[in-house]
């Protein structure tokens, strides 16, 4: 039994590939899609931390302050700051024996 496939055949000069319809538009489109898929996969593996961190945290920008008077914004900032200030002295130290 021969190990040769239908595509590769030995010739006097070496191995040749007999691709009958390599200029077929479907074959060309499939090749382009395959190459693009490979490039995108490589970029995804190289930069997956940056990409997914940007998708996870970059789109969340907090509540919109459009149309809110400046006095209410300042009051909100002061409430947030006072909530942070209150929690400063409430740390618990746990010592393991």
Curated annotation (Swiss-Prot):
Lipidation (S-palmitoyl cysteine): 50
GO CC terms: host cell plasma membrane; membrane; virion membrane
Intravirion domain ranges by topology: 44-97
Pfam families, A to Z: Flu_M2
GO molecular function ontology, one term from the record: proton transmembrane transporter activity
Functional summary from the UniProt entry: Forms a proton-selective ion channel that is necessary for the efficient release of the viral genome during virus entry. After attaching to the cell surface, the virion enters the cell by endocytosis. Acidification of the endosome triggers M2 ion channel activity.
HAMAP family reported for this sequence: INFV_M2
Description of its domains: Cytoplasmic tail plays an important role in virion assembly and morphogenesis.
Protein name: Matrix protein 2
Organism: Influenza A virus (strain A/Silky Chicken/Hong Kong/YU100/2002 H5N1 genotype X3)
Lineage of the species this protein comes from: Viruses, Riboviria, Orthornavirae, Negarnaviricota, Polyploviricotina
């Amino acid at each position: 039994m021969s190990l040769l496939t239908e595509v590769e055949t030995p010739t006097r000069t070496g191995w040749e590939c007999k691709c009958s319809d390599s200029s077929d538009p479907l074959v060309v489109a499939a090749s382009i899609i395959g190459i693009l898929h490979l490039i995108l996969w490589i970029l995804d593996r190289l930069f997956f931390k940056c990409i997914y961190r940007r998708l996870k945290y970059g789109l969340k920008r907090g509540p919109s302050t459009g149309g809110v008077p400046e006095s209410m914004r300042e009051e909100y900032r002061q409430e947030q700051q006072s909530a942070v200030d209150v929690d400063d002295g409430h740390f618990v130290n746990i010592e393991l024996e």
